[in-house]
UniProtKB/Swiss-Prot annotation:
Keywords: Membrane, Transmembrane, Transmembrane helix. The gene is yoaI. Its main location: membrane. It comes from Salmonella typhimurium (strain LT2 / SGSC1412 / ATCC 700720). This is Uncharacterized protein YoaI. GO terms for cellular component: membrane. It is a single-pass membrane protein. It is found in: Membrane. The chain crosses the membrane at residues 10-30. It comes from the Bacteria.
């Protein structure tokens, strides 16, 4: 019986973290002057 909820939590955390990083990078680029 191998049915870890850890894997599901890890995937959710990973996708949320990826979205967060994309938003942060976008904000940094916009504030940096994008040119």
């Amino acid at each position: 019986m191998y049915d870890p909820p850890f894997l599901e939590a890890l995937m959710i955390t990973a996708s949320f973290f990826a979205i967060f990083i994309i938003i942060v990078v976008s904000v940094l680029l916009l504030e940096g002057g994008g040119d």
